[in-house]
Amino acid sequence: MGIDISHRNKRKVVRRNPKSGDVYLRLMVKLYKFLARRTHSKFNNIVKRRLFMSRINRAPLSLSRLTRQMKKPGREGKIAVVIGTVTNDIRMREVPKLTVCALRVTAGARTRILKAGGKVMTVDQLALKAPLGKGTVLLQGPRKAREACRHFGPAPGVPGSHTKPYVISKSRERTNAHRA
C-alpha cells in the first residue's frame, strides 16, 4: 500500500519576474537581467532581485534615514542606490549634497536634494554610470515599520507581548471595545 505524500510544499517559491505590469519596471528588469548574466556582478544580481520584489518588500526610505546612512565613514561621494521610493522628511532642517538613484523620488524630496546641489538618477542611468556597482551604496527602507506589523507577534494580553490588538471601536468603557 502506498503512502499519500504531500508534494505541495516541495517547490521553493522564488520570483523570476515582477508581478507588476509597469512597463518601466519591466524595462529595468530586462536591463538588469542582462547585466547580471553578462557581468557576474553581485551588485547587479541584488538589484535584479530587488526589482522583482513586491511593494511591501520595497519599503520607502525617508530623506533623514538616507542622510544618516550616507554620513557613515567611507561613504562620502558615493551614489546611494534605493530600489524603492525616497520620501521627504519635514523634520530635517538641512539636506547635505547627495547623489541618489531610486525607482521613485517624491516631489518634495527631489526638490530638496537638487536645492542642496545633489543629483537624482534613475536606475537605467545608474547602469550606464556604474555598470558593476562601483562607488555605490545599496540601501533599503525598514520593512517592519509598517503599521500592520504592529499587530504581528504573540497575542495581545500575553505577558511580555507588545502586540497591538485589532480594535474596531474605541468606546468609553474598555470592555465595550469590540475586537475584530
From Swiss-Prot:
GO terms for cellular component: cytosolic large ribosomal subunit. Transmembrane segments: none annotated. PANTHER family: 60S RIBOSOMAL PROTEIN L18, LARGE RIBOSOMAL SUBUNIT PROTEIN EL18. Coiled coil: none annotated. It is found in: Cytoplasm. InterPro entries: Ribosomal_eL18 (IPR000039), Ribosomal_eL18/eL18-A/B/_CS (IPR021132), Ribosomal_uL15/eL18 (IPR021131), Ribosomal_uL15/eL18_sf (IPR036227). One of its GO terms (molecular function) is RNA binding. Residues 170-180 have a biased composition (Basic and acidic residues). This is Large ribosomal subunit protein eL18. It comes from the Eukaryota. Pfam families: Ribosomal_L18 (PF17135). Belongs to the eukaryotic ribosomal protein eL18 family. SUPFAM superfamilies: Ribosomal proteins L15p and L18e. One of its GO terms (biological process) is translation. Its main location: cytoplasm. Keywords: Cytoplasm, Ribonucleoprotein, Ribosomal protein. Residues 152-180 are annotated as: Disordered.
